[in-house]
Amino acid sequence: MPLRRGDGGDGRRTFELVDTAGADDDLDLLDAPHPVLLGGPHAVPRGTTFPLPPGASAPGASGPGALPPGAPPGPPGAPRVPGRRRVVAAAVATGVVVLVVGGMLVVDAATSRDARERLETARGAVRALDTAPTEQWRAPAAADRGTAFLPGLLVTVDGDEAVALDLDTGDEAWRVPVGGDEAVCGSWSPWERSAVPSRTVVCVAGSGVTPSWYDVSPPPRPREGTATVTVLDARGRVVGQRQAQTAGALLVPGPDGGLVRAERMGEPGEPSGAPVAVDPGAGESVDGVAGRDVVVTLEDAATGAVRWRRELPFQDVPWSCTSWDAETGGEEVDPERLLLVATETLVDVGGCGVAASFLPDGERLDDPDAPTDGAVPLAGGRFLVDADRQGSDGALRADRVLDPDGTPLLDVPGEVLDPQATDDPAPGVLLVRDGIALRAYDEQGARLWTFDGARVPEAVYVVAEGTAVVGTASTVVGLDALSGEQTWSRFVDDLAGERGHGAVVTQAFTDGRCAFLVLVDPATGASSRVVALELSSGSVVWSEDLDGGWGGLLPVQGRLLRWDGQTVALLG
């Protein structure tokens, strides 16, 4: 009598005993291949063993009441079972029931633990929110000088100190000096942040140290001198500290306890590129831009040992050397402009005449001979090499999807719509917009299905529990991730209510049962509403208006944080 598993909601699993008398068991089905889909049900791993109940014997064991080897069973319709044998039979039956119930409890615990671990590491995933979340705690925390996430901790910078807050309580876990009040700890990324916590946090402090992601005009210039590099573990202990020469280089915390250095080298070459109109009113222009090469190095932050070094020759990257000058109405040329972003999965350098993306081991993801392309991280650790990320040079090249190790997977016949939230850290489906159609591909690049709807798909908000939540200009649609069949549809204005005519979806999260959509009025942007839609039906489970001014929502290790730039709060 096998067990049929069902979803009891709230992350629980229920079981039903199914009578299979007279049914044939096809054991070959157990080894049949199964499709892997993002958000699909997760089985208990093979090899999982269940403990026997106290006093129960393993199959085939000897003992009181056991039949001798080869003994025939009793005849059908035996008139009576002796009392002692009835007791033994009852004990065996009780043991079987206890074994089944115990096995179900072990399966339930293993499933719940697996689901929780997946929600803590998947993109945009949060723990179960059965009702509208309320503020659990609030604490001061500025994000303008980087953030880092250690297991159970949020790390930010306060003056000359790195400060860690407990994600569950908001209490200060530790506070450590990092060598100066001009410091950067952790990183910042323009892409969806990885939910996997780091093992250490790297801080860089020194005169002129500024977040390199500030794309202001004019951008900050690296200064000559030294910077203090500090490496902290999850307990706030200093596991490494040294003085690093800046020598005019950009220094930012890098992946896996690393420090990334980017600097201009050599002398400018001959001008390249199209003429630049620096003052149209006066008829002034320059014949292209002459710039210097760039060297990117990843060092061990604690020891300074070089992990890898790459040289990037100056190239004609469209519009990378100029910015609009409001005073002259022309273009301002900045041949030294340099930007650097480093996360746990990607090192990306850009600026005048340079654009390159690297894995943490130094492997280059973009095409060195295509100055306009660049890599963007996708859900599940994959990457999209966007052929026109840095602009267009007129050449027709397809975007490419790469595996986490950089292996090409698919030349994209359209635009990848990457989900903002999943319930699995290893997605098995890729969604691509091709004209007005939405196409799904598996992990090997084979097409699964095509959905031709009445409206053009503009975004994929959530892919979880076998459902893809897709957005158009005015609707939110639920699609079966296995077949592409539409299962439900909702109008965005209906979800926004009276306050949100013309509202747009700006963020999305999931707990594996619901899709949580953040709706914002584009006219004001000051207030928003969070709506929870059941993935299987699209029905509204709850909705809540979020007042109190601007504040972005951030999923971190299964928790949902609200950040307004100066304070952070836990919603739950």
Predicted regions and their residues:
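Secretory-pathway ectodomains
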Residues: P2-G572
